[in-house]
Amino acid sequence: MANDNRRTVTVYGATGAQGGAVARSLLKNHAFKVRAITRKPDSEAAKALRALGAEIVQGDGWSKEQMVAAFSGSWAAFVNTNSDDPCFVDGHPPTEVDLGKIIIDAIIEAGTVKHLVYSSFVDTSSFTNGQASIKAADMKAKVQRYAADSGHFDTVCPLYQGWYMGIFLRQDYARALGGFPYFQDEDGFRTLHLPRWGTHTDMPIPWISLEDDFGDIVHGIFLEPENYNRRVVPTVSDVCTYPEVMDAVHALATGQKAQYIPVTDWEAHFGDSHHGRESLTIFKFGHFTNGKYFGHEPISTDISAYLKSKAAEAQGKDPSDRKLITLSEWFEKHVAPLI
């Protein structure tokens, strides 16, 4: 009978990296019931969430009818749309804004969702007066504003993501990064080869571990949503420059040698693929703003550390297990066994 009072949090994109992390964290707190929306309920990711206790609901974000049914009866929602979906690559309608508005309209029609956490980002066009915009970021910002301006929700929390530490787990990305962290050059170095983050010098980058921290940070918001209405929450596990990333590798017990060599010819480095063009706009934004990845929001772990601690406490974890993971700890845990 105790479970009858659980609050249902519905996660859109529950089998993705962000949504999956949120669902897994909330499932460790018996005060919440997790409803996971996926287009593929028979996927391995969906089966894994079901095994942990999630309610799996099939739904396509382009179908307002399916979304209304999926969100009905929910107390809160986490929504992340996939900017890398192939349907958005050509830049023609429908766009990510169109998808986001369908989902928001469906949540409103469902009628019960009081609290929305939306995976958004800084409006880069507004922040730079159109000088250095990131298309996907601006689209997410538009949908988040649309939700907030609807007047339907008690709270709408815009979530800004740090750079994924997990990019260093992908060997298919390693070649594009210069070989780092998997492949050694002829001198035995694992070289990180990317444009400088910042205008003239290496500026700090906010890093987030989806596996270790992201879900708990969002979980923490749902514990006290009233405190985060229209308040940006940057999700950050650690703050490090590229040279400090190299220091994290040097500290590994494996004794690896690593170096960072800034790219000078950005266009040649990124090429003309969709992903390459999108990556180029991110670094142009970093150059123009001198590394202000979150716009006016400070690059800090303070909010994330607090929310992580609250979620871990609600899960019954020991105080020693309520801290954010550092980049050095992350490399030791996730990368060292692979190299």
Curated annotation (Swiss-Prot):
EC number: 1.-.-.-
Domain of life per record: Eukaryota
Gene Ontology terms, MF aspect: oxidoreductase activity
Enzyme class: oxidoreductase
Keywords: Alkaloid metabolism, NADP, Oxidoreductase
Any single GO BP term: alkaloid metabolic process
Pfam families: NmrA
Binding annotation for NADP(+): 13-18, 39-43, 60-61, 81-83, 140, 164-167
UniProt biotechnology annotation: Notoamides have been shown to exhibit antitumoral activities. Notoamides A-C show moderate cytotoxicity against HeLa and L1210 cells with IC(50) values in the range of 22-52 mg/ml, but the IC(50) value of notoamide D is greater than 100 mg/ml. Moreover, notoamide C induces G2/M-cell cycle arrest at a concentration of 6.3 mg/ml.
InterPro entries documented for this protein: NAD(P)-bd_dom_sf, NmrA-like, NmrA-like_oxidored
Xref: PANTHER family: NITROGEN METABOLITE REPRESSION PROTEIN NMRA FAMILY MEMBER, NMRA-LIKE DOMAIN-CONTAINING PROTEIN
Name assigned to this protein: NmrA-like family domain-containing oxidoreductase notA
Gene transcribed to yield this protein: notA
